[in-house]
Amino acid sequence: MNVLDRSRVVRDPWEPDALERIPRGAHVLCIGTGLTFVDVAITLVAKSCRVTATSRHGLLPAIHAPSPSLPGLPTSFTSPLDVMRWLRHQPDWRAAFAALRPETQRIWRSFDDVGQRQFLRHARRYWDAHRHRMAPEVARLLEDHIARGSVRIRRGSAQDLAESHEFDFVVLCTGPDDSAALSRPPLASLITAGQARPGPHGMGVDTDADTGQLLTATGAPASRIYAIGTLRRGTLWESTAIPEIRSEARRLAALLVV
């Protein structure tokens, strides 16, 4: 396919029926090898499609397994490097991630702008692969597809792969598309009116860390406009999974219902 043929690029695989237009037997390039890719690949293989996936390091999500509890965390982490060093020295990395999870938002907020950027540049891909894991049953199914040749994993540039191989469709499996979200009418109009601004590092929208209230172009709280979930990734980082969203919704409900 022509990589510029946008009609054959699925930008958001979570849109209703997004994968329905990919015909049976198609050869599909997935960009990204995280949990979104896993779901997309299993769906497409069920339609007899061949799937090739690529990412910079070719890392697949780790697999869930029971793990013991850790007694606690250090009193503070001064940098992303501190976090990664601590994780490396734990006897059970799954238990370490579980211990970090309730404190991740606080730790993220304690990093300055430079520290957050260092994390995103150097540690994010490893964090995502270990933090967002596959269920064992899903992992076995994916491993079976890889063994049969229905799914292939490639490390490197998606552009090079697309130019050197023939694909019928491309599916973006890189997670939430912040640029697309901010360009949709509701958020775009708020940003144009100065009632919202992009979040730190271009992720989601900027919000008050405690209340979720949107911040205006000048940094002041927007009147009665709040966000939860993925729109708060720049502010909180850990804001995409059900436990965190549930906690945010609970706090917001307590704030709004008086």
Set out the residue ranges of the language-model regions.
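Flavin (primarily FAD) cofactor-binding/catalytic cores of flavoenzymes
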Residues: M1-F77, V83-V258
